[in-house]
Amino acid sequence: MANYTAADVKRLRELTGAGMMASKNALVEADGDFDKAVELLRIKGAKDVGKRAERATAEGLVAAKDGALIELNSETDFVAKNAEFQSVADQIVAAAAAAKATDIDALKAAKVGDTTVEQVIADLSAKIGEKLELRRVAYFDGNVETYLHKRAADLPPAVGVLVEYTGDGENGTEAAHAVALQIAALKAKYLTREDVPEDVVANERRIAEETARNEGKPEQALPKIVEGRVTGFYKDVVLLDQPSVSDNKKTVKALLDEAGVTVTRFVRFEVGQA
């Protein structure tokens, strides 16, 4: 008897882009463990596994103000376009900035006039008939560059970035803005290599080695191949290692060094993604 369902196969295909039989075989090999099946398909070369696996199904928007960034989810993009929904999001992010909120519980308890953020959301949810969720919040209190990006002209911003940095003058502001655009576009997850958890790097090495073996690479060449692929992984996920979108002959770190700017931390929210 199969230890997976048709729904599991469908979900795996949607997340990885793999074919039906490949998805079924991966679930069989993984003994029904969905996450393991995703990893197996990645080793075997399924397209876009990492990118697709991050997707969720929420609609909504991101909003930013004075060092605060929030994600407010709705069930449909129809509600996300609603002026009252967007106005409430503006009130919530203003409350986040005023309260310097860095977690959802603190933000829900923050004041909006005579009531709380939590009550404002509950009232709007009852009025429009959709479940609304305050998904996440961030707050930085240093020099902060903010960038919001729309997926379509008729939709509210779906991608939001905060970049905290040190560096004065026009060059500092321009460099921080360029970095915010970079993060929005290329989705860096970590600031430096040292920020990447050891278990994540170890898993990348293991996957790189297994993939190279599956490709028939000679055993003596594996260490060099693995190092090359791990370096490529760093270029994908580490901000300072990424080639700059404004000058791909230089890394983000090189351009920041030239501008005399140091990024101390950043955060990126995208509606519907982890």
Swiss-Prot record:
Family listed: Belongs to the EF-Ts family.
Chief localization: cytoplasm
Descriptive protein name: Elongation factor Ts
InterPro entries: EF-Ts_dimer_sf, Transl_elong_EFTs/EF1B, Transl_elong_EFTs/EF1B_dimer, Transl_elong_Ts_CS, UBA-like_sf
Species this protein is from: Mycobacterium sp. (strain KMS)
GO MF annotation, one: translation elongation factor activity
Record keywords, A-Z: Cytoplasm, Elongation factor, Protein biosynthesis
Record-linked HAMAP family: EF_Ts (MF_00050)
